A protein has these predicted regions:
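Phosphate-group recognition and catalysis centered on beta-loop-alpha active-site segments
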Residues: 1-271
Length: 271
């Protein structure tokens, strides 16, 4: 990430998916890269035959029309179905494995691997096998005990992104061992005066060389991660009210569903 230290980074949520391009597929990640993403985020599940696949939901109903859980099916059974596109019609795409994803992304962008703590050793054994330790980012929620214990048992230091969901969790973040590799901190914002976006907190992160990550995702009514400075207001009203506000308050990584629009805005303002 050294070459990107001076600019705002774009994290593309599940790749760039729209129309017939389905979330968490190689076409979605290729599209995200072409749209200007610096980081691509994906979710991982295990199949019944212990294959790591790219999939967000615990159930395959929404994208594959299958009942039960993802873990009820083998990779072959899941790949027998075509993924549904954004209007619920079968697309031309099928589920991808984590290994396929890593091969496609190697040497190109940072990768944020999500929803995989239950089989983290398996994930990072593959990351290590493919020589992608410097590209991989893993998030964790407070109190972070699992991440600390796991990191101590590795012979290389995983890049860990602590998630701080409220100012009461700041002491837990500050208590993390200094030897942990923490390039980024993700925060959930509840309002414009949130302590997690205060000048003092942001300055403290900068002093440690840690970037501040906020999700500008608009995930549905009642779900707010950015104090309403989100994708919706940025693309339907004015980016200055959404992405611009976050940047003005020290945010250096924005996770979005609109990477190309955010890239154009960043280019326009020189960020």
């Amino acid at each position: 990430m050294a070459e990107n230290q001076q600019r705002v980074l774009i994290a593309s949520h599940r790749g760039r998916f729209s129309g017939n391009i389905v979330e968490n597929t190689l076409p979605a990640f290729e599209t995200a890269i072409r749209s200007g993403a610096d980081i691509v985020e994906t979710d991982i599940h295990l199949t019944r035959d212990n294959v790591m696949i790219l999939f967000h939901d615990p159930t395959p109903l929404r994208l594959l029309g299958l009942p039960g859980k993802v873990s009820d099916y083998t990779l072959e059974e899941l790949r027998a179905c075509r993924l549904k596109n954004v209007i619920g019609e079968p697309s031309d795409w099928h589920i991808n494995t984590l290994e396929e994803f890593l091969r496609a992304m190697k040497g190109r962008v940072m990768i944020n691997l999500d929803q995989c703590w239950g089989f983290m050793d398996q994930v990072y054994d593959l990351v290590e096998k493919m020589g992608m330790e410097d590209q991989a980012l893993i998030k964790g929620r407070a109190p972070y005990d699992e991440a600390v214990t796991w990191a101590k048992n590795r012979h290389w230091k995983p890049k860990f992104i602590p998630i701080i969901a409220g100012d009461k969790e700041i002491p837990l973040f500050e208590a993390l061992p200094k030897e942990m590799d923490i390039p980024i901190v993700e925060v959930f914002l509840t309002g414009d005066e949130d302590k997690l976006i205060s000048p003092d907190f942001v300055a403290g992160l900068k002093h440690r060389g840690i970037k501040l990550w906020v999700n500008s995702l608009s995930l549905g009514s009642g779900i707010d991660l950015s104090a309403h400075h989100d994708d919706d207001v940025s693309v339907t009203d004015a980016p200055e009210k959404g992405w611009g506000w976050l940047i003005d308050h020290g945010v250096e990584v924005i996770q979005t569903d609109w990477p190309s629009e955010l890239r154009r805005y960043l280019d326009r303002i020189g960020k």
